[in-house]
Amino acid sequence: MGCSVLLLTITVSTLGGLVFGYELGIISGALPQLQTHFSLGCVQQEAVVSALLIGSLFASIIGGWLIDRHGRRTSILLSNLLILAGSVILTTGTSFFALVIGRAVIGFAMTVSSMSCCIFVSEMVTPERRGLMVTLYEVGITVGILIAYAVNYIFNNVPLTGWRYMFGFAIIPSLIQLASIVLLPKQAEVFVIHDDDSRQADRLTEETETSNQHQQSEKYGVSDLFKSKDNMRRRTVIGVGLVLSQQFTGQPNVLFYASTILFSVGFQSNASAILASVGFGIVKVIATLLAMLCSDRAGRRSLLIGGCSMLAVGLILTGFLCRQSVIDTTKRCTSVGPHSNLTLSAEHDEGVGFSSQTLDVHEHLRSFSQSEDIYKWIIFTCLMAVVSAFSVSFGPMTWVVLSEIFPKDIRGRAFSFINCFNVGANLIVSFSFLSIIDVIGLSGVFLMYGVVGIAGVVFIYLVLPETKGKSLQDIDRELSQTRMIHRQELCSIFQRRRFSPGYQRVQLTSTAT
């Protein structure tokens, strides 16, 4: 019984991640067609992209209450039905307003599903498997993104209706997930999957009893997230800091505007830009699988620090390379045609303005075409490194940590509260991306993201404890009793250096003989 419930749980969670990733990635290829079909301007394009996040923000506000009140399974079921409804609205939509409504409905459903699946799986498995199983959700997301990019490429050349097929394809995995949810027992949340080893089973039983006693004697409200009680304020700081670092390193824009970014750095057709974005999807899948295998070995903290460091380096290199390349342009959004504002060919140079170049475009492109081609592939390689670093670190590990650091009876509401910051930051980053490029150029945007990545490394080192191999009760107990250990260690190092005796000049005197 336990194994069958576990398999169904994994199936539901992974399919939820797949649909989540698909909806994140599909807009990248659909946006150029939507821009042409509906004559969308810059703000309208950003609105279609960000409508997903507006729905997600609303879900973050009420989703925690929904999960804690009605259970994880019911929440997943509701989100699945809403995704089906949103997909139908998008597939049959005939106006800009319908696109925004459909994307908002799907955004609400995706967020409820994301929170429910991560919490559900974390409560179902043993500590030794928790990192692996929760990371499976992120694997589903990356596979969904890869499928979305592939579908974008397939339907890119379908005139007029290609974007409808792109949005409608999400119905297939949603129906499969719906069937899996129906088969999942209603009381699956009360099952705990035991290891074959009897001592492990006994330990889990004891921890379950301890957890029940703890819930009876200790109840939390949302206001407790801001109090020093059981170090809840510290846990909230950890969660908020992780999601803000995750979003302000610009990863959402690499997903939402992948084709736009690749087009702007030299992939001079929609098809080539979309095909190159498939490479992002492949790298994300491979890197996430690596994180899944290493999360319970290397640990959450190590993967976050290492991945975020690599992320920062990749972003800064991309920024400098864009600045050196003649491709570093400021954008002027138009609704003439897909990516017409980014075209670098000599035939369409009238709409392109260079942020720091005043040379004639025709002569410049003829003189440096080979150099541009080299820059294009180096930048593409750096972006691949950025995508893989994110997929090893922030992508899966943020949600693993968030599912572990809060007590069970407030976990849903805490997850929801933290996700409000996650979605809010995502909304700011995504909605302002094209406008910021107009002001500081593509290189400035990536350099800014790189600085945030460096700050993220420092934050993780100072405040995040390692949680690998620990039960949820052990993590709760440790966080309730300890402060920011790594910050104290760092301060002690500086204090030792400050008060330790420095070098002293020794004067040697010679005595006359």
Swiss-Prot record:
| InterPro entries reported in the protein's UniProt record | MFS_dom, MFS_sugar_transport-like, MFS_Sugar_Transporter, MFS_trans_sf, Sugar/inositol_transpt, Sugar_transporter_CS
Q: Where are the transmembrane segments?
A: 7-27, 47-67, 81-101, 105-125, 131-151, 165-185, 237-257, 273-293, 302-322, 377-397, 423-443, 444-464
* PANTHER family named in the record: D-XYLOSE-PROTON SYMPORTER-LIKE 2 (PTHR48023), SOLUTE CARRIER FAMILY 2, FACILITATED GLUCOSE TRANSPORTER MEMBER 10 (PTHR48023:SF7)
**Record protein name field:** Solute carrier family 2, facilitated glucose transporter member 10
- Origin species, per record, is Danio rerio (Zebrafish)
Q: Which GO terms describe its cellular component?
A: endomembrane system; membrane; perinuclear region of cytoplasm
Give the GO biological process terms. Answer: circulatory system development; D-glucose transmembrane transport; notochord development
- Where is it localised? Endomembrane system; Cytoplasm, Perinuclear region
